Amino acid sequence: MPAACESLLDDIEDIVSATDPKPHDRQNARQNIVPRARKRNKNKIQEEEPPADSTIPGTQKIWIRTWGCSHNNSDGEYMAGQLAAYGYSITEQPEQADLWLLNSCTVKSPAEDHFRNSIKKAQEANKKVVLSGCVPQAQPRQEYMKGLSIIGVQQIDRVVEVVEETIKGHSVRLLGQKKDNGKRLGGARLDLPKIRKNPLIEIISINTGCLNACTYCKTKHARGELASYPVEELVDRAAQSFQEGVCEIWLTSEDTGAYGRDIGTDLPTLLWKLVEVIPEGAMLRLGMTNPPYILEHLEEMAKILNHPRVYAFLHIPVQSASDSVLMDMKREYCIADFKRVVDFLKERVPGITIATDIICGFPGETDEDFKETLKLVEEYKFPSLFINQFYPRPGTPAAKMEQVPAHVKKQRTKELSQLFHSYSPYDHKIGEEQHVLVTEESFDSQYYVSHNRFYEQVLVPKDPAFVGKMVEVKIFEAGKHFMKGQPVQDSYIYTPSITKPLAKGEVSGLTEESKPPNNPESLLQTSREGLQTFFFVTALLAAVIAFVGIKLL
C-alpha cells in the first residue's frame, strides 16, 4: 500500500510544481481584477422587432385543392376547418395564397397528372407546398415530391402542425397509422372542426380502407385494410351536423357495404341508428358498396332504402360482366351475384336508381368479354354509368399483366359510351309531380340543383327561397343526366333544416369563444405583442445572468 501511495504522489508532482500558485493565492489574485464594463444598448433590446409576418404561423392565406372521391373531399373539409380555427385564412384564389395544400387522388392516372402539374405550378410561383391524399401516402418517395411536406390520410388532425413547420421552412412527413391498443382506427376524430364545401351537405366517412385486394386498385396501398368508426361516433357526428343547418348527409368510404366487419357490427345497424336522428325532410345518401358485402343484408337494405328519409339510390360497381375478367380483377364475386343484388332491390324498392362503374380494356379482356358487358348495359339501362378506360397504376398487379392495345381500349370505351347515350332514362317521367330537395347551384349558374326521392337530378328555377328546401315540382323536360321541374303552384315549401345553415366558409363545430378573430390584423397584433414581450424578457434575463456571473468572478 505505501508503494502505491508513493507512486501516486510522484504522478501529482509531475503535474503541479512547487512554484505553482496555491488555491488561496488564486482567490487573493481575483481581488485585484477590475471588471470591464460590457457595452449594452438598452434601446436596441427594447425596440427589437419580431420576425417578419411571413414567419409567424397562423397569419397566412392557404389555398386547398382536392381531387377524387367524397372521402377525399371530406378530408379536405376537415383540414380546412382546422386551419381556419387556428387562424389561417382559407382562400379560393391560388395566386393570393402563401401556401398550397394539394389533396390528391390515386384512382386514375389523369388525376395524378393534374396533382403533379399543380406541384410544379406552386413551385414556379414560389409558394409553400403541403401534399396530402392517397398519392403521397401510397408512394411518398416519388422524385417530384422530394423535399415537400406530406400529411398522411390518417394524420389529417395534425394538418396545423405540418403547415406551421412548412411555413417556417421545414419539410415534415406524417404518414403513420392511428391505433388503439394495437388495433387500427378509422382515422382522425370525427368531431374536428371542418368547413363544408356546401353548408347544406355533410359528408361522413364511416370507415377507411377495404377488405378487397383488387389487382388494378392503388387506393388500397394508401387507405389500407378496413377500419370502421363506432356507430355512436357516427350518429353523434350526424346529429351535430343537423344542429348546424345541414339537410343532406352523404355516407362515404372505399366500400360502405363492408362497414363494421372489423368492430362486430354491420351497415344496416348503423343506418337504422342514423335515421333516428334525421329530421323530417332531410335526406341520407348511401355511398358506394361492392356486391359481396351487401348480398348478406339484402332484406334489411331494401327496408332501409324504402325509408322516406333515405334516397332510394345505390352505387354498386360491376366493372365487367365477364366472370373471367372479374376473376383477374380479384373482385370476389361473379356477374350472377351482381344481378341478384340489382334484381332484388329493383323488385323490393320500386324506382330505385342503381349506379355502376365499368372498366374498358382491362388486361386480358377479349372481344367476347366486352360483348358480355355491352349486353349487361343493354339489359339494365343504368341511368348513371361511370365509364373508365383502363390505366395501369404503378405498383399494382394489373400493371404487370399483358395489356390490351391502346387503340382497342379507346374503341371499347367509345362503343360503351355510345350505347349509354342511346337511351333516355328520364323521358317517361315528364309530367310527374315530385318532391325535390334543393341543395346547390348548377355549374352554369342558371339553375338550382335538386334531387328527388331516387337521387335523380332535377334542375329548378333559381329562386333563393328554394335553397335548402323541399319543393314540389312538375317535370316538364328530360335530358340524359337530368330533368327540369317547375314549382307546383300553391305547393308547400318545406324547410328540413332544424336551424339556420352555417355561412359559406364558416367553421363547423366551434363555439363563439373558440372562433378565430374576424380581423386577421388583430391576430397578427397579438402575435407581435407576444413576441415583443418574449424578446424583451429574454434579453433582460440574459443581462441579469451576465451581471451575476461577473460578481462571482
From Swiss-Prot:
Belongs to the methylthiotransferase family. CDKAL1 subfamily. It comes from Xenopus tropicalis. The gene is cdkal1. The chain crosses the membrane at residues 530-550. It is an enzyme of class 2 (transferase). It is a single-pass membrane protein. GO terms for molecular function: 4 iron, 4 sulfur cluster binding; metal ion binding; N6-threonylcarbomyladenosine methylthiotransferase activity; tRNA (N(6)-L-threonylcarbamoyladenosine(37)-C(2))-methylthiotransferase. Gene3D superfamilies: Methylthiotransferase, N-terminal domain (3.40.50.12160), tm_1862 like domain (3.80.30.20). SUPFAM superfamilies: Radical SAM enzymes. Binds 2 [4Fe-4S] clusters. One cluster is coordinated with 3 cysteines and an exchangeable S-adenosyl-L-methionine. Residues 17-57 are annotated as: Disordered. This is Threonylcarbamoyladenosine tRNA methylthiotransferase. It catalyses: N(6)-L-threonylcarbamoyladenosine(37) in tRNA + (sulfur carrier)-SH + AH2 + 2 S-adenosyl-L-methionine = 2-methylsulfanyl-N(6)-L-threonylcarbamoyladenosine(37) in tRNA + (sulfur carrier)-H + 5'-deoxyadenosine + L-methionine + A + S-adenosyl-L-homocysteine + 2 H(+). Pfam families: Radical_SAM, TRAM, UPF0004. Its main location: endoplasmic reticulum. It comes from the Eukaryota. Residues 196-427 form the Radical SAM core domain. Catalyzes the methylthiolation of N6-threonylcarbamoyladenosine (t(6)A), leading to the formation of 2-methylthio-N6-threonylcarbamoyladenosine (ms(2)t(6)A) at position 37 in tRNAs that read codons beginning with adenine. Residues 427-489 form the TRAM domain.
